[in-house]
Amino acid sequence: MSFSLIQPLSQIPLAFVDTETTGASADFGHRVIELGIARFENGKLVAQYEQLIDPQRRISAGVTALTGISNAMVTGQPTFSDQLPAAMKLLEGAAIIGHNIRFDLSFLRKEFRRCKLDIVSALSSAPVLDTVRIARRRFGRGGNALQRLAPRLGITPTAAHRALADALTTAYVFEKMMEAAKGWNTCLCDAYMEQGGPMGLLPANPRESLLPLELEEALEQRCPVIMEYLDSRQNRTQRKIDPLHILRRKGELILVAHCHLRNDRRTFRLERIVRMTRYEEQSLREAASDEEVASETPVEMSKEVPFQTAPPEVPESTVVQPMLFPTTEQV
């Protein structure tokens, strides 16, 4: 299908896509474990797809804690190549839209390549739209994670961190943000302008490194965050950190950060990070609910809070240019 810049969105099939993955970086061999697609035509949901996928590798403990998807759940499920024909029925002839879609595309490009397919040819150079880019132009950088952006727009998110649920929430967020233009009558050219310009299925920079959104923003802005982390003692802890930069070490991504709990620089394995929340937002929630989060004082985390499990820790190594996602630690 060919796409025209003057076509209104109502005349373009839109495929809202979300992936859940074994870890934070496709460049380090992490794989898709769940794919969700919601296809809209004429502004209406016409088809949806959701499938657990056997990644043929271990799922990180942080991902299991965040998504609830375990190694046992994906063992014996279809592989990505098994499910690609079914997924293509919803992707073909559609613009591709996602929340921080660059992250999802980094995984999908490699999965397509494993199937001996070029994603650009397979998807006919589909237009790409990113609700994160639109939100940043509308609200500024920071605080644009899907589960925080949706309520800001009056949308109640469905189950978080599952592929189809997040794809549907992204669709409703996109629809709401397009209201400031002409809704579904917004032409493709104007939709591009809403996000600051066109995007493609390939990265603008071939050496682009992608990280989870919350970490990316924390590294860019040098702002403190509250991190939930699975530590070396197999406890789930919560602490305030100042992210500094990312290391590559023995095939893993490591976050270097100042830990307020230890008042020292520490390293955290990316695969053990469950989630990150901006410190200001966490403080506002605490003030509103009058409840403490994991023994934290208004200034800093005062002690660790045990919750659940994690694999063993790693030592530290060489610095790589700052990248953009969440990460992990050495306690």
State what each model feature region is.
Residues 1-6, 173-226:
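Acidic two-metal-ion nuclease catalytic site recognized across multiple nuclease folds
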Residues 1-113, 117-123, 140-143, 149-161:
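Conserved non-catalytic scaffold segment of RNase H-like nuclease domains
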Residues 19, 99, 131, 243, ...:
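Residues immediately flanking
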Residues 126-142:
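Short alpha-helix plus adjacent loop in nuclease-associated cores
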Residues 162-175:
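Acidic, divalent-metal-coordinating active-site segment for phosphoryl/phosphodiester hydrolysis
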Residues 206-331:
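Core beta-strand-centered patch of the WYL/Sm-like small regulatory domain
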